[in-house]
Amino acid sequence: MAVPAKKRKMNFSEREVEIIVEELELKKHLLVNHFNAGVPLAAKSAAWHGILRRVNAVATCRRELPEVKKKWSDLKTEVRRKVAQVRAAVEGGEAPGPTEEDGAGGPGTGGGSGAGGPAVAPVLLTPMQQRICNLLGEATIISLPSTAEIHPVALGPTATAAAATVTLTQIPTETTYHTLEEGVVEYCTAEAPPPLPAEAPVEMMAQHADTSVKPQALKSRIALNSAKLIQEQRVTNLHVKEIAQHLEQQNDLLQMIRRSQEVQACAQERQAQAMEGTQAALSVLIQVLRPMIKDFRRYLQSNMPNPATASEPGQVAQNGQPDSIIQ
């Protein structure tokens, strides 16, 4: 019997992806790694099931929880791959290359080769990928290289190097964008190069090209380092918040201990007051009973018989013998 072919489900629509990203932005303190420190697994599972319910509400086919998690993992992998390409290109001092999804670039970044070499298409993130990047806390450095090409050298009538002149056009400066996680704050570093005369020697053009590349690479590295520092500062702020929460819990425990000590002190004070009252009552009772005891003692002394009179000296004997025999 032939095994029926497994029917493949439809790809995730843009609406489903938008719902996944929107829910993860709302529940990032439960599901995103650098926010969910100490969150129990039950809370994470409940959050994922909530996302699954919202996705199934708009999906044309029923989705399972592993599919939603796999889609989120693929989105993160794609965004991190693009960010890694940008970082590698910035650290190498050149613009990032194109990706599979970006294609070969637009008309301004086509593959035609001019005097300055082939232009390279920048890595640009879609708005949805930018939201995912902000959610992951990745610092993005998107470099937009110049699309203008240097015009070929226009030589004069003579072929001598001394008389060679060129016509230079101003090259648009490279702009660096840095997008933060919350609030999407952008930092731009742009500086226009100094204006050049209409006619300049060939050596001046080469010098200007060398000196304009280094500041742009330096600016890109400075922006990347500042992004890393900001991300580390965010992590430090999270740790500081956790420490503050622990300190608040300890303060609450100390207040509870102080309250219990105050209650114990009040109880001891009440016991001391009760003891003082008991002692006062006993002293009053003793003072009341003291004259009664004296009267009772006098009564007993008055009712006791008188002692026998002393015997005569001649009749008193010791050990049963008369006194005359002892003498």
UniProtKB/Swiss-Prot annotation:
Biased composition (Polar residues): 316-327
Biased composition (Gly residues): 104-117
Any one annotated GO CC term: nucleoplasm
Keyword Nucleus: yes
Span of the signal peptide: none
Subunit structure as annotated in this protein's UniProt entry: Interacts with HARBI1.
Region (Disordered): 88-118, 303-327
Biased composition (Low complexity): 88-98
Name this protein carries in UniProt: Nuclear apoptosis-inducing factor 1
Record function comment: Induces apoptosis.
Sequence similarity: Belongs to the NAIF1 family.
Location of the protein in the cell: Nucleus
Organism: Bos taurus
Main subcellular location: nucleus
Region of interest (Required for nuclear localization and apoptosis-inducing activity), residue spans: 1-70
InterPro entries: Myb_DNA-bind_5 (IPR028002)
GO biological process assignments: negative regulation of cell growth; regulation of mitochondrial membrane permeability involved in apoptotic process
